From Swiss-Prot:
GO BP term, example: steroid biosynthetic process
GO-annotated molecular function: all-trans retinoic acid 18-hydroxylase activity; estrogen 16-alpha-hydroxylase activity; estrogen 2-hydroxylase activity; heme binding; iron ion binding; monooxygenase activity; oxygen binding; retinoic acid 4-hydroxylase activity
Protein name as annotated: Cytochrome P450 3A7
Organism in which the protein naturally occurs: Homo sapiens (Human)
EC number: 1.14.14.1
Keyword Calcium: no
PANTHER family: CYTOCHROME P450 3A7, CYTOCHROME P450 FAMILY 3
Main location: endoplasmic reticulum
UniProt pathway annotation: Steroid hormone biosynthesis; Cofactor metabolism; retinol metabolism
Catalytic activity, reaction form: an organic molecule + reduced [NADPH--hemoprotein reductase] + O2 = an alcohol + oxidized [NADPH--hemoprotein reductase] + H2O + H(+); 3beta-hydroxyandrost-5-en-17-one + reduced [NADPH--hemoprotein reductase] + O2 = 3beta,16alpha-dihydroxy-androst-5-en-17-one + oxidized [NADPH--hemoprotein reductase] + H2O + H(+); dehydroepiandrosterone 3-sulfate + reduced [NADPH--hemoprotein reductase] + O2 = 16alpha-hydroxydehydroepiandrosterone 3-sulfate + oxidized [NADPH--hemoprotein reductase] + H2O + H(+); testosterone + reduced [NADPH--hemoprotein reductase] + O2 = 6beta,17beta-dihydroxyandrost-4-en-3-one + oxidized [NADPH--hemoprotein reductase] + H2O + H(+)
Function: A cytochrome P450 monooxygenase involved in the metabolism of steroid hormones and vitamins during embryogenesis. Mechanistically, uses molecular oxygen inserting one oxygen atom into a substrate, and reducing the second into a water molecule, with two electrons provided by NADPH via cytochrome P450 reductase (NADPH--hemoprotein reductase). Catalyzes the hydroxylation of carbon-hydrogen bonds. Metabolizes 3beta-hydroxyandrost-5-en-17-one (dehydroepiandrosterone, DHEA), a precursor in the biosynthesis of androgen and estrogen steroid hormones.
Length: 503
């Protein structure tokens, strides 16, 4: 029996031509960096270097930096990406040429009306939305939001005490994930939830579904391999965000907004109310006010941007304090001095906690949750003698720069003193970029820092943390869109009044 089908010569020829054309399509961008004389790892047809990302962006970027040093070119499937590590070049990309060339973040497939969200919007639309939202994140507005956040700090302490009193070690992501969820749903949607004790709440269920995003998901990969699918999927109303979840959240925002507009009494200050106010503000005459669809997109993106990042960083901070008891005691002493007798923290008192600020900054250096910053090159440009073609994504490997011995003595060590007043001025702002830099940095940076510090103060006023036999030391990281641990961080929590866990 013939193993090879008896096909006509024309059929074989057609098949061969089809395979050649398919190969050419799958490698059409892969010669760019070689042509430009930029080194980098060899890409595979269609997938580029994407399979190497499975070991973790941080590992792959570290390997490339050690091998190629200053710049290198990689391919995320079909997308050429230029990694840069020179602080002058980084400043040019993030600041000097932000508005003219490097305005936009990298698009990631069909997003539907979420294209209006501040972290996804492009060019003039992004500038307009950023201008409208910036007043929402002023220190004055954040100060007014502190009572809402503080309320969930108290819930966090109660939940942590309940977990600790079982005598079992505490899984930090469990309690900090609930805190992060509560604060974000409260400030973005005006919804009060104790999510740890109400896991069936539709807001909790839907927001958790929204956050299950995997960069190596077959659907996401197919869009990267065949980018022409994006407009087709957009036309079919298929997006990377789960349809049912988006439908639930948009309906919720609409109902909450309508309810608030009907009420006559003064509303509490949260992001949702501030955005509603901006729609009716006379000050918005210079820019077209936020539409209802844009308002919904911001509320949803706040969850996407804030939930995982806040809960992960809080977990990393407490882990570092547990494994460095001298630092933990020093932080607690500072908190007890500024806020005696467990006095509730305020916006102003949190800003007085200099050593706590050093601890937070050092943890963000060791664990920059986003790992990379990315900007799309809008037109052919030359920067510091290097030609960058239109369409290339310029990538700044934050994790690599945060761990580079060229800039940090003993970079793998947890040393909060790096960020003391004396040393802080020596830190290059284009090497240390936990929230990005320039006009398109993280708009919620101040909110995130205040939110985390309020939680840390309440927790450290009431508890001390120690490693236990289940604690993974040193921490191992796993692949994900953000910096995640291989195993959940588990610690022993002890009440500062009396030992309540695992003693």
């Amino acid at each position: 029996m013939d193993l090879i089908p008896n096909l006509a010569v024309e059929t074989w020829l057609l098949l061969a031509v089809s395979l050649i054309l398919l190969y050419l399509y799958g490698t059409r961008t892969h010669g760019l960096f070689k042509k430009l004389g930029i080194p980098g790892p060899t890409p595979l047809p269609f997938l580029g270097n994407a399979l190497s990302f499975r070991k973790g962006y941080w590992t792959f970027d570290m390997e490339c930096y050690k091998k190629y040093r200053k710049v290198w070119g990689i391919y995320d499937c079909q997308q050429p990406m230029l990694a840069i590590t020179d602080p002058d070049m980084i400043k040019t990309v993030l600041v000097k040429e932000c508005y003219s060339v490097f305005t936009n973040r990298r698009p990631f497939g069909p997003v539907g009306f979420m294209k209006n969200a501040i972290s996804i919007a492009e060019d003039e639309e992004w500038k307009r939305i950023r201008s409208l939202l910036s007043p929402t994140f002023t220190s004055g507005k954040l100060k007014e939001m502190v009572p809402i956040i503080a309320q969930y700090g108290d819930v966090l302490v109660r939940n942590l005490r309940r977990e600790a009193e079982t005598g079992k070690p505490v899984t930090l992501k469990h309690v900090f994930g609930a805190y992060s969820m509560d604060v974000i749903t409260s400030t973005s949607f005006g919804v009060s939830i104790d999510s740890l004790n109400n896991p069936q709440d539709p807001f909790v269920e839907n927001t958790k579904k929204l956050l299950r995003f995997n960069p190596l998901d077959p659907f996401v990969l197919s869009i990267k391999v065949f980018p022409f699918l994006t407009p087709i999927l957009e036309a079919l109303n298929i997006t990377v965000f789960p349809r049912k979840v988006i439908s639930f959240l948009t309906k919720s925002v609409k109902q909450i907004k309508e309810g608030r507009l009907k009420e006559t009494q003064k509303h509490r200050v949260d992001f949702l109310q501030l955005m509603i106010d901006s729609q009716n503000s006379k000050d918005s005459e210079t820019h077209k006010a936020l539409s209802d669809l844009e308002l919904m997109a911001q509320s949803i993106i706040f969850i996407f941007a804030g939930y995982e990042t806040t809960s992960s960083v809080l977990s990393f901070i407490i882990y570092e304090l547990a494994t460095h008891p001298d630092v933990q005691q020093k932080v607690q002493k500072e908190i007890d001095t500024v806020l005696p007798n467990k006095a509730p923290p305020t916006y102003d008192t949190v800003l007085q906690l200099e050593y706590l600020d050093m601890v937070v900054n050092e943890t963000l250096r060791l664990f920059p949750v986003a790992m990379r910053l990315e900007r799309v090159c809008k037109k052919d440009v030359e920067i510091n003698g290097m030609f960058i073609p239109k369409g290339v994504v310029v990538m700044i490997p934050s994790y690599v720069l945060h761990h580079d011995p060229k800039y940090w003595t003993e970079p793998e060590k947890f040393l909060p003193e790096r960020f003391s007043k004396k040393n802080k001025d020596n830190i290059d702002p284009y090497i240390y970029t936990p929230f990005g830099s320039g006009p398109r940095n993280c708009i919620g940076m101040r909110f995130a820092l205040v939110n985390m510090k309020l939680a840390l103060v309440r927790v450290l006023q009431n508890f001390s943390f120690k490693p236990c036999k289940e604690t993974q030391i040193p921490l191992k990281l796993r692949f994900g869109g953000l910096l995640l641990t291989e195993k959940p961080i588990v610690l022993k929590a002890e009440s500062r009044d009396e030992t309540v866990s695992g003693a």
